[in-house]
């Protein structure tokens, strides 16, 4: 099941989740949400990132919430389609 989400807030940290050696690397962007202060990690491809994405950067993410990983196994993930900062 997939649900569209919009997350606005401040970047806390950026970490690599899956390394492929190409621009298809998967990164996790931990964000403190502006609406309630909770923290959420959003997955995105390396091609969506650039050097300006540092801790403290204001960000808005358009993505989707899914309950499956890439192999179809159960997982709670938020995957970014678009990052604006």
Predicted features, each with a name:
Residues 64-85:
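OB-fold/S1-family single-stranded nucleic acid-binding modules
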Residues 1-8, 12:
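Short, glycine/small-residue-enriched coil/turn segments at secondary-structure junctions
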Residues 5, 25, 38, 74:
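Exposed loop/turn and edge beta-strand positions of beta-sandwich/beta-sheet ligand-binding modules
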Residues 17-31:
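Short aromatic-glycine-enriched beta-strand elements
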Residues 6, 60-62:
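Hydrophobic beta-strand signal
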Residues 36-53:
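Beta-strand/loop nucleic-acid-binding surfaces
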Residues 12-15, 66:
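Conserved positions in beta-strands of structured domains
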